[in-house]
Amino acid sequence: MGLFGKLFGGDEQQTQAPAANTPIQTASTEGREVTLDLNKGGMLNLAKNDFLNLSKTDFSLENIRVSAGWDVKTSFFGSDFDLDLCAFLLDASGHLTRSVNGLVYFGKKKSQGIQLDHDNLTGAGDGDDENMFVNFNNIHPDVAQIVVAVVIYSGKNRKQYFGQVKNAYVRLVDQAQRPEKEIARFNLSEDGGKATAVKFAELTRTVNGWTFKAVGEYLNASIQDIEKSYR
């Protein structure tokens, strides 16, 4: 299905999304803090619940790229898998911000300081499938957290689930360096079963700057379901 169908075709409403008015579930400081010395040329492989304080690196991380990739099983008879990278911009109470566009996805690719690139409708090819560009200096001050998720478009209707998705990952890239420097990567190792979405990561504003946390929380939800849970 093309972009027109995605925008106006009416994705299914599933029943197992988080409850409405759910505040931010996971503080950025819950989990294991990891550190990185970019001068030593390192790159972090994050485990679930690991978080990286971006202000503690040896470079000023102001312009980053959040990239996601995956492999899916193909079928001669089934529909192509269409996985979508999206971001939910939350205020300090854990709800979608009203100060700027609070949902960045294939239908509205920009918000202040955030932009998605092209929408990969099939996931074909090697490397990153979709990318989100973040300029922390331009993020609206009311935005306290950015939840990064990947959702299978119309997954339930097509009987497509994360249990059929392999080698899924999200990675953080410093765009200010030339060549670009991969800072951290989180490989999704758990079986997704019948889930149709995954909260991959959280970017959270703290008094000292931003943190990046590997989440890896599976959901039986559409983009609309997740959006409703943050209202």
Where are these regions (language model features)?
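Intrinsic-disorder/low-complexity signal
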Residues: 2-145, 149-231
